[in-house]
Each structure stands twice: as C-alpha cells, then as structure tokens.
A protein has these predicted regions:
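Histidine-dependent nucleotide/RNA phosphoesterase domain, centered on the 2H-phosphoesterase fold
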Residues: 1-153
Length: 153
C-alpha cells in the first residue's frame, strides 16, 4: 500500500453516487464543529490482524478513539441523514498495511509476520474525508478535507 494511503478507517459515509456535493460540504462543516471538542488520542499499533484480503495493525485501546468515532458518526447523521458504515462490527480500529487480491495460502505470511510486531505509538489528531473509487488495488483516492481535533490538553 502506498504510504500516502495509510489510514485508520473510521466510517464509510456512503457510496460516491449516494452522497451529494451539498452533503459533502455539510459533512465537512459538521465534522469541524463536532471535532472541536475532541482531544488527540494516542494509540498503539502492533497486534497483526489477518483478513482474507488484507493485513492490518490493530489500534489499541479502541476506547481512546471513541470520542472521534462518535463525533464523526454524529456529523454524518446530521449532514446526510445516514448512519454511515463501520468497517467491522463491532468496530476494531486498525491501519491496513497490505491488500491482496490473489488466491494464495496465508500461512507463509503469518509465519513471517507472526501475530504481533513491535509496538508503535501514534497520535491521531485529525480526520480526513477521502473519496475512494475503484477496487482496493486501483483506488482513485481523492482527499476532500482534513479536519483537526481542536481540544488540546
């Protein structure tokens, strides 16, 4: 995965043909308002998660990111009338580091990486609204806005 595409998926607002320009503008404004009270959160990446089509690092503790998720969900509802879609249910915050569209055995990858990499702390201090089109290996990735968390300790 290209470095600039590394991300922690928070919420999928909807398909690109379902969200209007007016809703996108409203969503950005709502996110700025809601995230004004959210503090940056430090999480640890290290535990490796395996999926048939991806390898990810879990962001722990998930609770540290709950205020951000709540703010984004509230902004999404206010701007679009939709709930948004979590990547997993229950939500497991993670950073995907590799995708695979080939059929291949997972065992060699699991043997090479194991279940845990050295811990790495990262601070999440903003969200980005990104429009993605196409399959995962050929995304058209267009950042629409970056919204910082405004509440600092």
């Amino acid at each position: 995965m290209p470095y600039e595409w590394l991300h922690l998926t928070t919420l999928v607002v909807g398909l690109t043909d379902e969200v209007t320009e007016k809703q996108l503008t409203a969503l950005i404004a709502e996110a700025r308002k809601r995230l004004a009270d959210v503090r940056p959160a430090t999480v640890t990446l290290g535990r490796v998660l395996y999926h048939p089509e991806a390898i990810a690092l879990e962001a722990r503790p998930a609770g540290a990111l709950a205020p951000m998720l709540d703010a984004v969900r509230t902004a999404t509802r206010a701007a679009t009338g939709r709930e948004g879609i979590l990547g997993t249910d229950p939500w497991i915050p993670h950073v995907t580091v590799a995708y695979s569209s080939a059929e291949q055995p997972a065992e060699p990858v699991i043997a090479a990486l194991g279940r845990h990499l050295p811990d790495c702390e990262v601070t999440v201090d903003h969200i980005s609204l990104v429009v993605q089109d196409g399959p995962e290996n050929l995304w058209d990735w267009r950042p629409m806005a970056t919204v910082p968390f405004s509440a600092f300790p």
